[in-house]
Amino acid sequence: MPSYRLTPLAEEDLFNIISSTIESWGSAQAKVYAQTIDAALLKLAQYPDFGRERSDIYNGAKSFPIEKHIVFYQISDNGIDVARILHQRMDPSKHF
């Protein structure tokens, strides 16, 4: 079954997203949002071509929106490798 792998930067992004959600909305909502992101990444690993081609970011890059965030990834042999998870208001060119 295809899966996803987070790079260290993507792990840091996810940690910051969850921490910010806890601060703003509480632990229960953070858990819901973490589960939403996990489910979306698992689905994206199964159907990696759902994402938009983003060779402007780096060769082989794709992006896909999840709620208020954009996942940047590339297709791997086992699913997807997630490079970053950025808020939709962030300029991706400043984070790669």
Each model region followed by its residue ranges:
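Enriched for short, Lys/Arg-rich terminal
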Residues: H69-I70, Q74-F96
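Short proline/glycine- and basic residue-enriched helix-capping loop/turn segments at helix->loop/beta transitions
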Residues: L42-Q46
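Basic/aromatic recognition patch in beta-strand/loop cores that engages polyanionic ligands
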Residues: D49-N78
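Conserved beta-strand segments that form the floor/walls of ligand-binding pockets within enzyme
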Residues: R5, P65, D81
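Arg/Lys-rich, positively charged N-terminal/basic patches that mediate binding to nucleic acids
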Residues: M1-A34
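Short, hydrophobic secondary-structure boundary micro-motifs
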Residues: A30, R52-R54, K94
